């Protein structure tokens, strides 16, 4: 499927399509994904960092110097964050603070192949995936100052605007993010800040791991629940905190 030039053109700043990527869902959300076989991308305004979606919070200047709001463009974009990080204490504590997280594994190729609707004649304008670039605050501010409305909104292609959603402050570089992006051209796909898409999890995902802080009995209980829902993907527990004691010799 990646033989389609238009699809390959919508992969931004990514060379290895078989790079493993991960995401932590809540147990409740992942259970819903198993049953519904659907995945939701959210409006960038719901992202946490105040500098996120910075372009959409600003005005841009026309070539004649007139300032215009980018809020209309804001309404038509949705995204979902993934990471190259296999296991991270910070990620578990942020996204699974109640020990109710599920880390899933896939690849850029598997995720985007399922997401990109090649039957849609406007697919090249709507479905994208890219690696986040981390920049100093001053670099971002210089980028904003030099950006015009024409730079990002005109020309018929979504790539320049998509790249603005792939910029984040360098303080967050540890997140090592990859973002799935959707441009809702007709404005009728999303609802209440969420755009839902088919998600063939049994084809896309290769691994499911539960929170490393669960006890063995808690892990077995949650594992059985997922299996009962129909999850056929191997389910393990993150070994982030596993420690095998070693005897110390006193010579």
Q: What do these predicted ranges mean?
A:
Residues 1-251:
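Partner-binding and oligomerization surfaces adjacent to conserved cores of proteins
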